[in-house]
Curated annotation (Swiss-Prot):
Residues 217-657 form the Myotubularin phosphatase domain. GO terms for cellular component: cytoplasm. It comes from the Eukaryota. The modification Phosphoserine is found at S603, S745. This is Myotubularin-related protein 10.
């Protein structure tokens, strides 16, 4: 039995503000058996009782008592105490309210107050003191803090070492997804959250049960349908890489110019880095195509092969137009610079005391260079949109390995040019096509195995640039920013095969080896089938998935009812609403100013450098005229959208970076208020439309069942509406920072305290690693 009041610590940790030792500390819980909820294949590796989870740093009256558990999937804090101050919780079905996936852990710090010792724990390290405090720094900017004042000293030490060991695996097959899938194959009847845990039928799951299937581009037919959808008549699906016989970092099927024979491709492949020969991404209706390729490493054959490839791409164009090559390695920042900018952004968002540097906040943000890089990728992609759309030239994105920057630029161009990729299903298919199947190295770039030298947040940068477009053109996107934030979080859950591997070949190879070691019979399957992140029902209820829908969205056609019959109302091609896209007071606010088109001093944003040389001056003036004309017209929400790049238009994605900071919350404020009101309005329109449609088909009560199938999270008052809306709305909605970040207990502080709080994210050099 432990006392009601823990001993007063004699050491004040500089990691966070000192723990409060007031007399109002929460009383001890009743001793009862607390058991975790485990997924198939998940096992508890260590646990400790009588742990106190700190909710705030300036008081301990809200702290929770419970059991801290480390499994092979997550750390979990189990308590019977209700979460204080929290009126809403957006729950992930795979994770409890106090759970953190092991692959989301950034840094582990143990502290002993009495001996004045602290240590950053790495894998296979020893801990020579008994910790009184454990601080978990997460990749999503959360901080979770536990106290062991009443726990057994040895038990506390063991659980800390277990967390450090299992959160930093050295082998891919040690990630939880393998145990999960292995368990599924041994017991095919297993289901998770009422949903089959198989990796077969994958659906977008963003709302209704009739959601369109997300193509995974693992088969010939998926690629064939995409070429037909885009009208790529001069291109064909190639199958020479079946079994990954040519390249281990390309998909088994991809699209190439029809004039290139398989035998030629096999010969050319040896000259490219990673054997990543040119492959098709997308085609414009005017015939221009977007192509990706790695560098040609054979200097002697470079000119010959390059000319042959360009000729083949030219022949695939209906007008036999020339090819424009963009060297991304020269035009954009590299992955190391992007990682350095993200580290600085992380430090700024959750580390710097705002009261001391309030007047320097914007300059500090600028010095991180994160927004500069966001602008650089948007700008470069917009310039290539001009080449594809106005110049009618095919564009080749060239990069050394062709699997980092080209993933981002190719995806961003397609989001700007093709409204299909601004729908939920289309966006998911884009990620499958340009990231997962094209060999983006999720394992290394997300640092699942703690190889920090290869880490770089390129996928997050893509989501950020997409959010910038969503913010500027809200009616052009079917999905919401909540969807983008949840998608970012899913990259840090070691369950989904979507974000777990460096290439499709690695998935097949590693999962086959694992299956053999576990005596799993694969049959005709190519490796184990891992759950797909697009099966959203595994993570969220149907009600919560409605938050993925954007109430601003204007679809291609909208159903309407006239005299009880349903008709289709076609919007004019140039639909426009001043509330959705304000016109600039002058053209200087758009993309066509000198500041936006030309690189400023000390900027990494360079002008396009085509190879071979082309008429750069005439193209520059043509691009300027193109952008002027485009911004002078109302936006076509069902066509091309271009970003505004001035300082006022490129913003920090607050929901992603500030959601766990209580001081950054605006109670009953932020974009959620407009989202809430528009959701109610959209739901009311949908409800009235459904009622009118069924007016002649049956009694009024017959339509009420359909009314429950609302696509909106916030619903207008209806006959069967009992859910209501959350009592607490803030700029962090639907995420609640309470209990996930040890900060001040007062929620909704003034904006002058926007980033105030504790010093965190200490480097190993900063800490005194005393043993």
């Amino acid at each position: 039995m432990f006392s009601l009041k823990p001993p007063r610590p004699s050491f004040r940790s500089y990691l966070l503000p000192p723990a409060q030792t007031d007399d109002k500390i929460s009383s001890e819980p009743k001793i009862k058996k607390l058991e975790p909820v485990l997924l198939p294949g998940e096992i508890v590796v260590n646990e400790v009782n009588f742990v106190r989870k700190c909710i705030a740093t300036d008081t301990s009256q809200y702290d929770l008592w419970g059991k801290l558990i480390c499994s092979n999937f997550k750390i979990s804090f189990i308590t019977d105490d209700p979460m204080p101050l929290q009126k809403f919780h957006y729950r992930n079905l795979l994770l409890g309210e106090h759970d953190v996936p092991l692959t989301c852990i950034e840094q582990i710090v143990t502290v002993n107050d009495h001996k004045r010792k602290q240590k950053v724990l790495g894998p296979n390290q020893k801990l020579k003191f008994n910790p009184t405090e454990l601080i978990i720094y997460c990749k999503d900017f959360r901080i979770v803090r536990f106290r062991f004042d009443e726990s057994g000293p040895e038990s506390a030490k063991k659980v800390c070492l277990a967390i450090a060991h299992y959160s930093q695996p050295t082998d891919l097959q040690l990630l939880f997804a393998f145990e999960y899938v292995g368990k599924k194959y041994h017991n095919s009847a297993n289901k998770v959250n009422g949903v089959s845990s198989g990796g077969g039928g994958v659906w977008s799951g963003a709302g209704s049960t009739g959601s369109q299937r997300t193509p995974l581009f693992e088969t010939y037919s998926d690629w064939d349908r995409e070429t037909k959808r885009t009208g790529a008549s001069g291109w064909r699906v190639c199958s020479i890489n079946e079994g990954y016989m040519i390249s281990t970092c390309l998909p088994e099927y991809f699209v190439v110019p029809s004039s290139l024979a398989d035998q030629d491709l096999k010969i050319f492949s040896h000259s490219f880095v990673g054997r990543r020969m040119p492959f098709w991404c997308w085609s414009h209706s005017n015939g221009s195509a977007l192509v990706r390729m790695a560098l040609i490493k054979d200097a002697l054959q470079q000119r010959k092969i390059d000319q042959r490839i360009c000729n083949a791409i030219t022949k695939s164009h209906p007008q036999r137009s020339d090819v424009y090559k963009s060297d991304l390695d020269k035009a954009l920042p590299n992955i190391q610079e992007i990682q350095a900018a993200f580290v600085k952004l992380k430090q700024l968002c959750v580390n710097e005391p705002f009261e001391e540097t309030e007047e320097k906040w914007l300059s500090s943000l600028e010095s991180t260079r994160w927004l500069e890089y966001v602008r650089a990728f948007l700008k470069h992609s917009a310039e290539l949109v001009y080449i594809l759309e106005s110049q009618r030239l095919s564009v080749v994105l060239q990069e050394e390995e062709g699997r980092d920057l080209s993933c981002l630029v190719a995806s961003l161009i397609q989001v700007m040019m093709d409204p299909y990729f601004r729908t939920i299903t289309g966006f998911q298919s884009l990620i499958q096509k340009e990231w997962v199947m094209a060999g983006y190295q999720f394992l290394d770039r997300c640092n699942h195995l703690k190889r920090s030298e290869k880490e770089s947040p390129l996928f997050l940068l893509f989501l950020d640039t997409t959010w910038q477009l969503l913010e500027q053109y809200p009616a052009a996107f079917e999905f919401s920013e909540t969807y983008l934030a949840v998608l970012c979080d899913s990259t840090r859950i070691s369950l989904f095969g979507t974000f777990l591997f460096n290439s499709p070949h690695q998935r097949v190879k590693q999962s086959t080896e694992f299956a053999i070691s576990k005596n799993i019979q694969l049959g005709d399957e190519k490796g184990l089938k891992f759950p797909s992140v697009w099966d959203w029902a595994l993570q969220f209820t149907a009600k919560d998935r409605t938050l993925f829908h954007n109430p601003f969205y204007i679809g291609k056609s909208t159903p309407c009812v006239q005299n009880g019959s349903r008709k289709s109302f076609k919007r004019t091609k140039k639909s426009y609403s001043s509330t959705l896209r304000g016109m600039p007071s002058c053209l200087k606010n758009g993309i066509i100013t000198d500041q936006d088109l030309l690189p400023r001093r000390n900027s990494l944003v360079l002008k396009l450098k085509p190879d071979p040389p082309q008429h750069t001056d005439s193209q520059h003036s043509g691009a300027e005229q193109y952008f002027k004309e485009w911004f002078s017209r109302p936006a076509n929400l069902h066509g091309i959208i271009l970003p505004r790049l001035s300082g006022t238009h490129i913003k920090l994605w607050k929901l992603c970076y500030f959601r766990w900071v209580p001081e950054a919350q605006i109670n009953l404020g932020g974009s959620i208020m407009a989202f809430h009101k528009l959701s109610l309005l959209a739901d009311e329109v949908d409800m009235l439309s459904r009622m009118l449609r069924q007016h002649r088909s049956g009694p009024l009560e017959a339509c009420y069942a359909e009314l429950d199938q609302s696509r909106m999270y916030f619903r207008a008052t209806g006959p069967h509406d009992t859910l209501g809306t959350p009592e607490f709305l803030s700029s962090s909605f639907p995420f609640s920072p309470v209990g996930n970040l040890c900060r001040r207990s007062i929620l909704g502080t003034p904006l002058s305290k926007f980033l105030s709080g504790a010093k965190i994210w200490l480097s190993t050099e900063t800490l005194a690693n005393e043993d």
